[in-house]
Each structure stands twice: as structure tokens, then as C-alpha cells.
Design a protein with these regions (language model features):
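N-terminal intrinsically disordered, acidic low-complexity segments at the extreme N-terminus
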Residues: 2-21
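Internal/C-terminal transmembrane anchor helices
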Residues: 45-52
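Peri-catalytic and regulatory segments of divalent metal-dependent proteins
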Residues: 77-89, 112-113
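Extracellular/periplasmic catalytic domains that process cell-envelope and extracellular macromolecules
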Residues: 90-94, 221-224
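Extracytoplasmic
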Residues: 93-97, 103, 116-119, 174
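Cell-wall polysaccharide-cleaving catalytic domain and substrate-binding groove, primarily
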Residues: 103-128, 132-134, 184, 231
Length: 254
């Protein structure tokens, strides 16, 4: 068929024979040029889209920071928390996360006692306060109403939990850590185990394990799920903005 077309065209327009001979090669070149142009445009679109979502996440964090008021009482404990965080986590410690955690636990009121008996700035239950020195001797004798002990114990206990959980990113890993601080490491492990049986990614907290309940009461489940979200997605940004130290960035999953 192609041969007959070439013969007919060549007999009618003799000068077109060479052009016809080169036509398949030109079509192939045009195809690949179009293909790579499409790839380049898709890549540019992806990068622009990723930048948009990262910028959106950052701006949302700033918006949340504007909604959060740091209690005046926090200032007197700022230096103590920074020292405790650096001693346990190093100089790049996510101080803003720990500050937001204390904010969430007690609103920086050292004399706070919850309805279930949790005590002090970091709201340690008496049993947990007694147990902690057995796995972290550096915390010393339990003293939940002593601000120095309480803030040091919070940083140490967070690190102990952090070393026993996993996540796809530091942001996800800290969410698991905070859930364990609030409700116990055993519950986190049970939630992750159930997530695996449901085909849910057990190394991802937000939008994954946070939706899985291995048996907690509705009230306990709701409180536990709000805890990492309030700290990581809202309150830490107020402390970052106020210059307390670094936090942990929300990595956008595309």
C-alpha cells in the first residue's frame, strides 16, 4: 500500500520522491519530540503542584499559629525546657513540639491535677512517674510538681517512646510518639497491629493508624487522636513563630 502511494506520488510530482523517503523518519522524530515535550511539561506541573502544596501547608501552619496564644506562664519555664530538650535530644531538639505538648497537657500551670490524677506541667500519672526512673535513671526521684523534673521527664519519656516507634517521616514518627505519651505505648502497638490486618499502612499516623481503634472507649479514642493533631498541626507553629526553637515539619504526601 505504502509502495503504491509512493509510486503514484513520485510519478505525479517527481521532486517529492526524496521527501516521501524521509517522511517515516520525520514522523518518528516528531513523535519522540512530542513525547519528551509531554514529559517535560508533566515534570514542571508536578514540581509546581508540589510547591503549591508545601506552601499551602506552611501558610496553614502560620494561620494556626495566629490562632494560638502562648500562656504568659510559659515564659518562666522556657529556658528550663530548652535545656532539658537539648540535654536529651541534642541541639537540634524539636523544642517547639515539646512546648506545644506542655501547652496541651497543662497550659503551663504547674499546680494542675487532672480529673484522673495526672500531675504537674507534664501531667504524669503517679504510677508513670514512679516507673520512669527504672528505664531512665537520669530523671531522678519522681517529683511531678517540680518544674525542672517535670520538663526533663517529658523530654526523656518522649525520647524513650520515640526510640520504640517508627514512621515514614519524623512528623509521622512524632505523632506515634505523642499518641503513646497520651495513651500508652501498648495501645499504639495494638492500633498498629490492627491496622496491618486491615491493610492500612502502620507506619503512617495521619489518615491511617489514627483512624484505627483497637478497643479504646470513644472518649479515650477521641482524646488520643486529637492530642498529636493539636500539637503537631496547630500549636507547635505558635512556638516556632515565637522563637522557642525548631519544630517538626509536616511533610506533604502527594
Amino acid at each position: 500500500m505504502w509502495t503504491r502511494i509512493k509510486t503514484a506520488v513520485a510519478s505525479r510530482w517527481p521532486g517529492a520522491k526524496a521527501n516521501l523517503r524521509a517522511l517515516p523518519r520525520r514522523l518518528a522524530t516528531l513523535f519522540w519530540e512530542s513525547f519528551w515535550l509531554g514529559v517535560k511539561l508533566m515534570t514542571i506541573g508536578f514540581l509546581v503542584g508540589m510547591g503549591f502544596w508545601l506552601a499551602l501547608g506552611f501558610l496553614c501552619g502560620l494561620a494556626h499559629a495566629a490562632d494560638v496564644t502562648i500562656p504568659r506562664a510559659a515564659q518562666q519555664y522556657r529556658a528550663t525546657l530548652v535545656r532539658a530538650a537539648h540535654a536529651t535530644w541534642g541541639l537540634d531538639a524539636p523544642v517547639a513540639v515539646f512546648a506545644a505538648q506542655v501547652h496541651t497537657e497543662s497550659w503551663w500551670r504547674n499546680d494542675t491535677v487532672s480529673h484522673v490524677g495526672a500531675q504537674g506541667l507534664a501531667q504524669f500519672m503517679p504510677a508513670t512517674a514512679r516507673w520512669l526512673p527504672s528505664v531512665a535513671p537520669e530523671t531522678g526521684k519522681p517529683a511531678p510538681f517540680n518544674p525542672g523534673w517535670s520538663l526533663r521527664a517529658l523530654c526523656v519519656y518522649d525520647k524513650w517512646l520515640w526510640d520504640r516507634v517508627a514512621g515514614h517521616s519524623d512528623f509521622e514518627r512524632m505523632a506515634f510518639t505523642l499518641s503513646a505519651y497520651n495513651g500508652g505505648l501498648g495501645w499504639v502497638n495494638r492500633d498498629r497491629k490492627k491496622a496491618r490486618t486491615l491493610g492500612v499502612d502502620d507506619r503512617r499516623w495521619f489518615g491511617a493508624v489514627e483512624n484505627v481503634n483497637a478497643g479504646r472507649s470513644k472518649a479515650a479514642f477521641r482524646e488520643n487522636r486529637n492530642y498529636p493533631r493539636l500539637i503537631l498541626k496547630e500549636r507547635q507553629y505558635a512556638y516556632i513563630k515565637a522563637g522557642w526553637g525548631p519544630g517538626i515539619k509536616d511533610e506533604v504526601r502527594l
